[in-house]
């Protein structure tokens, strides 16, 4: 729409400030053309996330963040249903009520969920079950990523822990979520293998305020832990 109306790179859409992690925050001018091109690239590169029916995202990044602005815009370009929340104290209930199909969060959010699950399991029998389940999830993920197949014994142990441990952790994110996109900080590989092993792949990406959003992102069908995926078109 922006490009068809001739708005393009001439007309400024917004000014978004950088985080200031490398110095004084800078105001970045982003044009209608910048954001329109970014959205079109995302629709072509990652349709499973934003351009098939019944996709839902609960956005809890602040709208002062360029990625939140990008997702709010691309929702209109695709078929993504977008929910907004700002209260982290109610986020678990919000996940349950809204039922997102994908998640978008910095690595710290997934660390907190893992730590909370570990603390809740405690140090008794439940704690030992959780610890064993964690080991099996990581082994399963690494075996799958190796491309050499998953041994039968590991598949059986994984199926057992999926029923008694992993399913409960997945429900924290709602009933429909099948993968998550994360960035903004390095993701610990052990944590990434754990989530991949329980059936919630964390797709790492990279972007900057100056690029209007994402530059690279991993895909669900081609997710190599420890990488940020392929660059978007353009």
What do the PLM-derived regions correspond to, one by one?
Residues 6, 78, 98, 198-201:
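Short, structured coil segments at secondary-structure junctions
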Residues 13-39:
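Conserved AMP-binding A3 loop
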Residues 12, 18-21, 57, 62, ...:
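Conserved S/T- and glycine-rich ATP-binding loop of Class I adenylate-forming
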Residues 154-156, 175-182, 187-234:
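Conserved ATP-binding loop and adjacent catalytic segment of the adenylate-forming AMP-binding
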Residues 1-11:
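Single conserved hydrophobic/aromatic residue that forms the stacking wall/gate
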């Amino acid at each position: 729409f922006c490009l068809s109306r001739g708005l393009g790179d001439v007309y400024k859409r917004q000014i978004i400030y950088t985080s200031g992690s490398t110095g004084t925050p800078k105001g970045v001018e982003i044009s209608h053309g910048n954001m329109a091109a970014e959205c079109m690239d995302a629709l072509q590169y990652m349709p499973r996330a934003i351009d098939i029916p019944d996709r839902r995202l609960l956005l809890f990044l602040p709208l002062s963040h360029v990625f939140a602005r990008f997702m709010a815009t691309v929702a209109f370009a695709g078929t993504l249903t977008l929910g907004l929340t700002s209260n982290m104290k109610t986020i678990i209930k919000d996940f349950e009520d809204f039922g997102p199909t994908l998640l978008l969060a910095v690595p710290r959010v997934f660390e907190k969920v893992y730590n909370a699950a570990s603390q809740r399991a405690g140090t008794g029998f439940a704690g030992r079950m959780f610890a064993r389940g964690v080991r099996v999830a990581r082994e399963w993920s690494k075996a799958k990523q190796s491309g050499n197949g998953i041994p039968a014994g590991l598949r059986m142990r994984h199926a057992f822990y999926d029923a008694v441990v992993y399913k409960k952790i997945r429900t924290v994110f709602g009933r429909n979520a099948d993968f998550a996109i994360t960035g903004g900080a390095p993701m610990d590989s052990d944590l990434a293998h754990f989530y991949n092993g329980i059936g919630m792949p964390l797709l790492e990406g990279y972007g900057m305020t100056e690029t209007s959003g994402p530059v690279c992102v991993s895909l669900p069908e081609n997710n190599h832990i420890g990488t940020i995926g392929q660059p978007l078109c353009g």
